[in-house]
Amino acid sequence: MDARLWHQQATAPPRPMPTPIPVETFDTMSDVAQDVYWDDLTTAMTGLVLPSVLAQRASHHLTRLVERNRLRPPGAKAIGSVSASFAVGKSTFVKDWAQAAYRDLLGPACADPRPTWNPEPGVTADWIPHVYITLRAASKIRDVLAALLLTMGYPSEGLVRVTTTRVIHAFRQHGVRLLLIDDSHFLDVSNKDSRDM
């Protein structure tokens, strides 16, 4: 997912739920009307995160972790991880949490279709405070670096040492504060470079 798509998803208004109707009323509707109602309901529920005590705790923990990292000096930071059984909504939860944090961070800039900032005097750059990537099976470090660069609109070709430097520069240039890696278990850790990452 590139930075513009992330921004669009994070700032799009939630889909409205259709007006609830009694089962008796639904049963009297035509097949076409029932299909339309189900389509509206399914569309509105896609990506819906149901509140739970576990989700609230995880949200609080992740928010606190990001805030502590923000206060730390440059260098290594603490890493958060969400782990649970297959298909319980980990990715949906993390995206929901991160997009809420993104909206809070941007504030009035959410209305801008392409937020910008000034990393240094006289320089204007796209403001991309959150970068979200999804790893593919057996991803190597070059694949991760390529995904990060493509997300921010940079060319992804080159030697690992070159693309690593390019990623660091791009993160600094675009004000990246949060890196989200979905399906990190797909990272191929059979070589030292990937394990070091």
Positions of predicted regions on the chain:
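Post-Walker A helix-loop "phosphate-sensing" segment adjacent to the P-loop in P-loop NTPases
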Residues: 100-119, 154-155
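Residue-level preference for the first positions of well-ordered beta-strands
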Residues: 77-81, 130, 178
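Alpha-helical scaffold elements adjacent to nucleotide-binding pockets in ATP/GTP-utilizing enzyme cores
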Residues: 61, 93-97, 143-151
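Hydrophobic residues at beta-strand termini and immediately following loops
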Residues: 133
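A short, basic N-terminal segment
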Residues: 1-78, 107-109
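Mid-core helix/loop region of P-loop NTP-binding domains shared across ATPases and GTPases
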Residues: 18-37, 115-127, 139-147, 155-197
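Walker A/P-loop nucleotide-binding motif
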Residues: 74-96
